[in-house]
Amino acid sequence: MTLRARGARLLGGLLFFTLLAAGAAPLSWDLPEPRSRAGKIRVHPRGNLWATGHFMGKKSLEPPNPSLLGTTHHISLRDQRLQLSHDLLRILLQKKALGLSLSGPASHTPYRRLLVQTLEK
């Protein structure tokens, strides 16, 4: 083979290899981003939790309203006694309606009688 044939064959192989490599490469020419400090930030898959709770609450520039600070109802001692007496009256009326004795601790006397009668048989 002559020198000219070898050169043509080498040139053809090189051209074939170039076309093969160009076909395997992506069709768009993506230029790499310039290296800067922004490119060196590590991103964690779960996200960066550094400032998670920083902006959680509402930030307000106005001073808080004093009427909103005391939103809990302060019940006086007299109101508490009145509420307790109403609750006691309601409980006593329920016990009377059910036929339970009003004196003494709440016992299961009607059920106890039934249980004793059942066990004696």
From Swiss-Prot:
<dbReference type="GO" id="GO:0140374">
    <property type="term" value="P:antiviral innate immune response"/>
</dbReference>
<keyword id="KW-0165">Cleavage on pair of basic residues</keyword>
<dbReference type="GO" id="GO:0032727">
    <property type="term" value="P:positive regulation of interferon-alpha production"/>
</dbReference>
<dbReference type="GO" id="GO:0160024">
    <property type="term" value="P:Leydig cell proliferation"/>
</dbReference>
<keyword id="KW-0391">Immunity</keyword>
<dbReference type="GO" id="GO:2000845">
    <property type="term" value="P:positive regulation of testosterone secretion"/>
</dbReference>
<feature type="signal peptide">
    <location>
        <begin position="1"/>
        <end position="24"/>
    </location>
</feature>
<dbReference type="GO" id="GO:0005184">
    <property type="term" value="F:neuropeptide hormone activity"/>
</dbReference>
<comment type="function">
    <text>Stimulates smooth muscle contraction. Induces sighing by acting directly on the pre-Botzinger complex, a cluster of several thousand neurons in the ventrolateral medulla responsible for inspiration during respiratory activity. Contributes to the induction of sneezing following exposure to chemical irritants or allergens which causes release of NMB by nasal sensory neurons and activation of NMBR-expressing neurons in the sneeze-evoking region of the brainstem. These in turn activate neurons of the caudal ventral respiratory group, giving rise to the sneezing response.</text>
</comment>
<dbReference type="GO" id="GO:0090290">
    <property type="term" value="P:positive regulation of osteoclast proliferation"/>
</dbReference>
<dbReference type="GO" id="GO:0046887">
    <property type="term" value="P:positive regulation of hormone secretion"/>
</dbReference>
<dbReference type="GO" id="GO:0043005">
    <property type="term" value="C:neuron projection"/>
</dbReference>
<dbReference type="GO" id="GO:0005615">
    <property type="term" value="C:extracellular space"/>
</dbReference>
<dbReference type="GO" id="GO:0031710">
    <property type="term" value="F:neuromedin B receptor binding"/>
</dbReference>
<dbReference type="GO" id="GO:0032715">
    <property type="term" value="P:negative regulation of interleukin-6 production"/>
</dbReference>
<dbReference type="GO" id="GO:1903942">
    <property type="term" value="P:positive regulation of respiratory gaseous exchange"/>
</dbReference>
<feature type="modified residue" description="Methionine amide">
    <location>
        <position position="56"/>
    </location>
</feature>
<keyword id="KW-0732">Signal</keyword>
<feature type="propeptide">
    <location>
        <begin position="60"/>
        <end position="121"/>
    </location>
</feature>
<keyword id="KW-0027">Amidation</keyword>
<protein>
    <recommendedName>
        <fullName>Neuromedin-B</fullName>
    </recommendedName>
</protein>
<keyword id="KW-0966">Cell projection</keyword>
<dbReference type="Pfam" id="PF02044">
    <property type="entry name" value="Bombesin"/>
</dbReference>
<comment type="similarity">
    <text>Belongs to the bombesin/neuromedin-B/ranatensin family.</text>
</comment>
<dbReference type="GO" id="GO:0160023">
    <property type="term" value="P:sneeze reflex"/>
</dbReference>
<dbReference type="GO" id="GO:0160025">
    <property type="term" value="P:sensory perception of itch"/>
</dbReference>
<keyword id="KW-0399">Innate immunity</keyword>
<dbReference type="GO" id="GO:0007218">
    <property type="term" value="P:neuropeptide signaling pathway"/>
</dbReference>
<keyword id="KW-0964">Secreted</keyword>
<dbReference type="InterPro" id="IPR000874">
    <property type="entry name" value="Bombesin"/>
</dbReference>
